[in-house]
Amino acid sequence: MSVDVAIIMGSQSDWETMHHAADTLEALGISFDARIVSAHRTPDRLVAFAKGAKAEGFKVIIAGAGGAAHLPGMAAAMTPLPVFGVPVQSKALSGQDSLLSIVQMPAGIPVGTLAIGRAGAVNAALLAAAVLALYDEALAARLDEWRKAQTESVAERPSNEA
């Protein structure tokens, strides 16, 4: 059985952000595989992964990166699969450097760029789910239920309780 979504990141420290994508996919019943694939420290691993991702059965790639953040763009350059980039918040510039690196792709190499940090990781998983749900009615129903539960979790009035 193939795995639908690949979650790749440049280093172990990126997992602090990227596990939110994994948690969201898991909550929706979507199969995923998380890997460390650094554009700078393991370039051969990146090339092998990106060029082989479709053959492995992946349908979507979520790529998280901080700092120079070349991973999403380099992966997108080597695969026909949709790539969603998540800027990981960095200490130096709070992830703004990563955001600009990921979002400024040249025409012809698209990367769907999300928000910095946790929100971006969750939304990348939700976008991946939406893509997969186009061809999976059961997943579409689970995604609708997830959104309904999110809506129902929002209070109508503010509270002093924590």
UniProtKB/Swiss-Prot annotation:
Recorded GO MF terms: 5-(carboxyamino)imidazole ribonucleotide mutase activity
Keywords assigned by UniProt, alphabetized: Isomerase, Purine biosynthesis
Family matches, as Pfam families: AIRC
The protein's annotated pathway: Purine metabolism; IMP biosynthesis via de novo pathway; 5-amino-1-(5-phospho-D-ribosyl)imidazole-4-carboxylate from 5-amino-1-(5-phospho-D-ribosyl)imidazole (N5-CAIR route): step 2/2
Species in which this protein is naturally found: Brucella melitensis biotype 1 (strain ATCC 23456 / CCUG 17765 / NCTC 10094 / 16M)
Entries under NCBIfam families matching the protein: purE
Isomerase in keyword set: yes
Protein name according to UniProt: N5-carboxyaminoimidazole ribonucleotide mutase
